[in-house]
Amino acid sequence: METVDCGEAAPRAPQPASIQVHFHHESGLAKLLLGGCSLLQPLLLPRPRATSRALGRHRLLATSWVMQIVLGLLSGVLGGFLYIFSSTTLRNSGAPIWTGAVAVLAGAVAFIYEKRGGIYWALLRTLLALAAFSTATAATIIGAGRFYEYHFIFYKGICNVSPSWRPTGAPTLSPDLERLQQCTAYVNMLKALFISINAMLLGVWVLLLLASLLPLCLCCWRRYRRKEKRDLPLEETVRSE
C-alpha cells in the first residue's frame, strides 16, 4: 500500500506549476484588457468645452492649410494651360505660377511649424501667410481686370482666309464652306476653354483669399474671447460695488 501511495503522489507533484502558469496567462490578458480600456476611455468620456473648442480651431486651421496646398497646385496647373493660347497679360505676368507656389509653401510651412515648433518656423509661417494673401489678392485683381482679353484673341475674322489685297471686281467663288465651319467650331471651343480656365483661376484665387484669411479670423476671435473673459470679472465687481 505504501508503494501505491508513493506512485500516486509522484505524478501530482507538477500540478502547482501548471496552476502558476495559467495564473500568469490570465494576468497578462487582464493587463491587456485594462490597457485597451484605458486607451478607449478618453474617446468614450465627454470632453470639456475648452478642449473641444481647441480641437475645433485646430481642425479649421488644418483645413485651411490643406486648402492652400491643394488650391496652390491647382493654380499652377491651370496657369500652365494658359500657355496653349497666345500671349495674354495674365500669362505674361506669371500670376498663376507664383500665386500657387506661395500658397503651397505657406501650407507646408504651417504644417511643419505645427509639428516642430520654433521661432524661425513661426516667423516664416507668418511671412508666407501674408505673402499668400497678398499674391492671391494681386492675382485676383489681374485676372478680373484682364478677363475681356479673349475678344482680342478670338476675333471674328480669325477664320477668314480670303486675301485682303484682292482688288474689288466681279464676285468670285467663296472659300470652302466646310473648312470655314470647322475653323469656326474650333475657335469657339478654344474660346470656351480659355474663358473657363480664367473663371476657374479666379475661383481658385478667391478661395485662396478665404483660406489665408481664416487663421487671421481665428486669431482675432481668440483674442476677443480672452478680452471678454478678462472684462467679465471687472463688470461683476463694478456691479457688486
UniProtKB/Swiss-Prot annotation:
Instruction: Tell me the Pfam families matching this sequence.
Output: CD20
- The record's principal subcellular location, in a coarse class, is membrane
Q: Which controlled-vocabulary keywords does the entry list? A: Membrane, Phosphoprotein, Transmembrane, Transmembrane helix
In its keyword annotation, does this UniProt entry include Transmembrane helix?
Answer: yes
Membrane in keyword set: yes
Membrane topology is:
Multi-pass membrane protein
Listed under GO cellular component are: membrane
- Sites bearing Phosphoserine, chain numbering: S38
Where would you find this protein in the cell?
A: Membrane
Q: Which sequence ranges are marked TM in the entry?
A: 65-85, 93-113, 127-147, 193-213
Write out the similarity annotation: Belongs to the TMEM176 family.
Q: Which PANTHER family match?
A: LR8/HCA112, TRANSMEMBRANE PROTEIN 176A
Q: How does it assemble?
A: Interacts with MCOLN2.
- The name on file for this protein is Transmembrane protein 176A
Origin species, per record, is: Bos taurus
Which gene underlies this protein? TMEM176A
